[in-house]
Curated annotation (Swiss-Prot):
Mg(2+) 2 binds at residue 419. It comes from the Bacteria. Mg(2+) 1 binds at residues 412, 419. It is found in: Cytoplasm. Its EC number is 6.1.1.6. It comes from Idiomarina loihiensis (strain ATCC BAA-735 / DSM 15497 / L2-TR). The gene is lysS. It catalyses: tRNA(Lys) + L-lysine + ATP = L-lysyl-tRNA(Lys) + AMP + diphosphate. It holds the Pfam family tRNA-synt_2. This is Lysine--tRNA ligase.
């Protein structure tokens, strides 16, 4: 008899009723949810240390352990059972024999427990006849009674939307999902250590701001009752981090949430995690070098290699990353046009319309060029690539290039046809910054909801003097997607935003 064959035969509501009755009986006996069991071992650690020992070597050592976890499988074979429990690290098998437990306990207690219940067990490690490391149990306790059954073991949680809505069930039943989120944690931990080891100071800046700045995006708004003022969830921490550079914190970083009131897609979630860091006395070339080193190291640290496959595409982060300008990328993927044509407003407008871009009257040449780039080239940037020389028109916070003030000392990093990072030598000319803010206000008044607000306090900070600085933002969620072979941003967010479930 096995628990696997029982679950599909019983209606879920009936199973819940049966489990609640069992819980009621536990309450009658005393403490139904004990909290006095202390484990001393995790499944993965036991496998790592003892899997390679022979039966005889392990028996000679007489290793006693205390383990705990959720019961995922059970095979009842008369006077003995095999059960598998799952903890945060993996699974370990229990061998539960009637004669090793107090009289009557096996039949009146253990056999009445259900899959999904959380157990604590003590016993001695041994290796079964099939070679599996197991615990020969001499004490086993029910720590938490699960009132709802787990999804069918053979089919798992197959409904993709349900996996997102009930992530806890996804994590219980889907080892791949657990591995993805463990990898996410390792990636963030690596980045944090990488920057800290280079004397970057981790800081925290406001999540609610009176003026949403630092990016071109539509913000979420809220109301502060005590101050009777409108506030915005931040779209980026950039302007606050640069205030810290003005204040003398010359190398700072923050890993935190940003919020943008925009659409949902496989690449976008309104709430997302960003790394932003700022480095005084450095320029955008230094940033590209540091970013290349950091991303290569992240792949090697988490995946064990700078060469990996994601969504069927082979990537090589071990080679030097390609670098080219916005216009060079357009010409590469649209060789029938020339740099001269792209630098002429009338011709560039014609090219944009040829590729399906609807040019708005308020756009300048720089905006037209970027729209062409995003349509023609962006999705083709598969291998790691830095794109440089972004027009000043679409880069209101970036420093102008010394030799060509039409463009800025800015780059974006792409891999897999997606933008993963945006960085530039920072604009530290207060008067130029004020003028660009005014241009953004004009664009907002012309109907651009994503144009920036005028931030007078930030301009005042710049007037006190900010050293030459470079800064960058990296989308953690998209980076995790790439390094974990995930198709959707929802696969790397524990609790992605979802539409309310219909009744």
């Amino acid at each position: 008899m096995t628990d696997k064959s029982q679950a599909p035969e019983v209606d879920v509501n009936e199973q819940i009723a049966q489990r609640k009755a069992k819980l009621s009986a536990l309450r009658d006996k005393g403490i139904a949810f004990p909290n006095d069991f202390r484990r001393d071992s995790l499944a993965a650690d036991l496998h790592a240390e003892y899997d390679n020992l022979s039966k005889e070597e392990l028996a000679e050592k007489g290793i006693r352990v205390k383990v705990a976890g959720r019961m995922m499988t059970r095979r009842i074979m008369g006077k003995a059972s095999f059960a598998t429990i799952q903890d945060m690290s993996g699974k370990i098998q229990l061998y539960v024999a009637r004669d090793n437990l107090p009289e009557g306990y096996y039949n009146t207690e253990f056999k009445k427990w259900d899959l999904g219940d959380i157990l604590g067990a003590s016993g001695t490690l041994f290796i079964t006849g099939t070679g599996e490391l197991s615990v020969q149990v001499d004490e086993v306790r029910l720590l938490t009674k699960a009132l709802r059954p787990l999804p069918d073991k053979f089919h798992g949680l197959s409904d993709q939307e349900m996996r997102y809505r009930q992530r806890y069930l996804d994590l219980i039943t889907n080892e791949e999902s657990r591995s993805t989120f463990m990898a996410r944690s390792k990636i963030i931990d690596y980045i944090r250590r990488f920057l800290s080891d280079r004397q970057f100071l981790e800081v925290e800046t406001p999540m609610m701001q009176a003026i949403p700045g630092g990016a071109a995006a539509r913000p979420f708004s809220t109301h502060h009752n005590a101050l009777d003022m409108e506030l915005f969830l931040r779209i980026a921490p950039e302007l606050y981090l640069k205030r810290l550079v003005v204040g003398g914190f010359e190398k700072v970083f923050e890993i935190n949430r940003n919020f943008r009131n925009e659409g949902l897609s496989t690449r976008h979630n309104p709430e997302f995690t960003m790394l932003e860091f700022y480095w005084a006395y450095a320029d955008y070339h230094d940033l590209m070098d540091l970013t290349e080193q950091m991303l290569r190291g992240a792949a090697e640290s988490v995946l064990g290699s700078a060469q990996f496959t994601s969504q069927g595409v082979d990537y090589d982060f071990g080679k030097p990353f390609e670098r080219m300008t916005v216009l060079e990328a357009i010409v590469k993927y649209m060789p029938e046009v020339s740099l001269e044509q792209l630098n002429d407003m009338n011709t560039a407008t014609e090219i944009a319309e040829q590729v399906g871009v609807s040019v708005k009257p308020s756009w300048g040449l720089g905006k037209v060029q970027i729209e062409i780039f995003e349509t023609v080239a962006e999705h083709r940037l598969i291998q790691p690539t830095f794109i440089t020389a972004y027009p000043a028109e679409v880069s209101p916070l970036a420093r102008r290039h010394d030799d060509n003030p039409f463009v800025t000392d800015r780059f974006e990093f792409f891999a897999g046809g997606r933008e993963l990072a945006n960085g530039f030598s920072e604009l530290n000319d207060a008067e130029d910054q004020a003028e660009r803010f005014r241009e953004q206000v004009e664009q907002k008044e012309a109907g651009d909801d994503e144009a920036m607000f005028y931030d007078e306090d930030y301009v005042t900070a710049l007037e006190h003097g900010m050293p030459p600085t470079a800064g960058q933002g990296i989308g953690i969620d998209r980076l995790v997607m790439l390094l974990t072979d995930s198709a959707s941003i929802r696969d790397v967010l524990l609790f992605p935003h979802m539409r309310p479930k219909a009744d």
